[in-house]
């Protein structure tokens, strides 16, 4: 038998969940509502072409995560393949456009940032940089914290100063 994640007392609530369980992501996430109630980031394997019978697709997982207050943000990676036709063998890999699977980042709904605590915004800023590699998302969280006066007004300036110059627009 399988236990629901919400029923496992030894598992604490999560700030960030990374999950890759060969097609069972939806079943696990839908049974982890309490554990994910304060989470700010989920990284889940998503599938666009099924590999397993009855496997949920990206849309199924997206619907569940939206119901739990998350929105798709970006892909950590996305694997593509050629559509198999008699002529497709003549194409280079970069011409393959059919999305197969990948890892997707879902973040707490940023249109409702007022519902997030300062602690959640802090965690989001850190995870945005350390896990997602998204300076834009990190700045979003820092600016929201600055608007609440939870960080110094120049916190974003300090963060921007740490980024490689190639990531910044010229002044």
Indicate where each model-derived feature is located:
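Short, charge-rich amphipathic alpha-helical segments embedded
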Residues: 135, 139-170
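S-adenosyl-L-methionine
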Residues: 1-5
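Conserved acidic-Pro-Pro-aromatic motif
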Residues: 8, 12-141, 145-146
